Amino acid sequence: MGKRKELKDNDVEMGGTGRPVEDDESDEVMDIVNVDFEWFDPQPAVDFHGLKNLLRQLFDADSQIFDLSALTDLILAQPLLGSTVKVDGNESDPYAFLTVLNLQEHKDKPVIKDLTSYLQRKASSNPSLAPLSQLLSQSPIPPIGLILTERLINMPAEVVPPMYSMLLEEIAWAIEDKEPYNFSHYLIVSKTYEEVESKLDMEESRPQKKKKKSGSNVERFFFHPEDEVFERHAICSGSIEYTHKHDDGLSDSKRAFQDLGIKTSGSLILIDGPKLEAAVKDVTDYVKPPV
């Protein structure tokens, strides 16, 4: 399968990566940073550590459960599928990435076995994820495309649509070449959070947020704004509790999130295979910057 990615040759200039100024901080000065982003194929020679760190961020407290090195190697073993986003050229670390892994094709690999078992177990604990739990329990497992994507916390959502658009093209070309990427479903692994009373005596600073009720009058916020759109197209979606818990209010030097008085949770979104393209179009419109 030949790579036919062109967007990496066209820089996209975006600014305003900080959060909006709220009423109680009107006297603060907002910094606007203009950055040119470039899209690249995954590069086995340079992207291993950057992708592994982003995977650790994605799986949060439960990242220790998985062999992230093996998972990173699996992502890099299909360099013609998926994208990274960088700002300092191809040899620099990725600021964002997106890829898809075939759970059926890789079912015998230990890291995929662990992931599939984990996802099935978590889905079975949330009634809203019952359709996903049933799919993951089938033997053999259906050709589910596991979408893994993460980015640095202040990366603008505008980098997302090009990654998904290129992924759809690459999947179509792979299917033409009779490669195993004809997915029945797509499963997006992501993260949400809830605000909790912070035990830290410091000024609160939240990530940009999109609200969604999750029951019991608790607001659920999206780290990835596009997830709100994907959930509208989903067969099912819902939050999952991490196996390993963060202490309330714990300051974690590797995750600024814990300094902000928030509780993070995993998020799973199951989309019917043929419906992903329409979902991506809606995401493109949703994150489009105002004219």
From Swiss-Prot:
Residues 1-25 are annotated as: Disordered. Keywords: Cytoplasm, Nucleus, Protein transport, Transport. GO terms for biological process: protein transport. The keyword Signal does not apply. The keyword Transport applies. Pfam families: BCCIP. Residues 1-11 have a biased composition (Basic and acidic residues). InterPro entries: BCP1_family. It is found in: Cytoplasm; Nucleus. Disulfide bonds: none annotated. Belongs to the BCP1 family. Involved in nuclear export, actin cytoskeleton organization and vesicular transport. This is Protein bcp1. It comes from Aspergillus fumigatus (strain ATCC MYA-4609 / CBS 101355 / FGSC A1100 / Af293) (Neosartorya fumigata). The lineage of its organism: Eukaryota, Fungi, Dikarya, Ascomycota, Pezizomycotina.
